[in-house]
């Protein structure tokens, strides 16, 4: 277990969740100020380097071959496309470029191509992150050798609810990939998706599993489901805004030193809801009007919101 937070029982985490809203936000903000500048937001950019055609059946995803969505599959980007994206990310003030590929598990030849992309990203002084699916022995080490800073592999939800959403990859597969990444000396980015029909207990359980990893993730993305037509979750009810903010606050309390990122779904959030999430301890966002396959708040809108709230981009 990584630290005292890993000793939290599920009931204890649920008790934190159930605190009066003002008390919960106050506690989370106190924790946040112990480890971060409360007005600094870390900014990343997300790039889909290989889109669609994924053999997995994740119920939320437009890239699955199992679902009838309007998404058109695209091949792996070439280095010059990645270079252009890195240049734009740097110009927009991002500190990290996160590259995602719709693979179940990459071939070794794919890893070599991604390794070259990581090199291009590093040329621009950006941190690098990739999300490529499950990794085979030796692949994490190759990525680390290429200079990879972060590997994203979300747990998505609790072990108990997971089977309601995904059938082609086990929960243990995800944990095994996180272990391989950590063993290779790469920092971990891992979180979940809210609003898939899970309960508060499921959300608390997911956080408990993350807390029980040998070392806590350095980055924890909190996604709000973006229902996509043609996917099994297209009619899912959106998560209550206060429940979303509660989850951010509990995440901050359990993981004092992690970056807590507002990820997918932010485009649909009001400025007021985002401000509450920042107050609850969120301190990272994706810049740009596109994530992997869904929309995102524009960089101009984000900067205007930062100005209204007195926030600034983190220099770390």
Curated annotation (Swiss-Prot):
What's the protein called, per UniProt? Biotin synthase
What EC numbers are recorded for this enzyme? 2.8.1.6
Q: How does it assemble?
A: Homodimer.
Looking up PANTHER family in the UniProt record yields:
BIOTIN SYNTHASE, BIOTIN SYNTHASE, MITOCHONDRIAL
Keyword tags: 2Fe-2S, 4Fe-4S, Biotin biosynthesis, Iron, Iron-sulfur, Metal-binding, S-adenosyl-L-methionine, Transferase
* Claim: Oxidoreductase is one of the keywords in the record: no
Gene (UniProt) = bioB
Q: Which GO terms describe its molecular function?
A: 2 iron, 2 sulfur cluster binding; 4 iron, 4 sulfur cluster binding; biotin synthase activity; iron ion binding
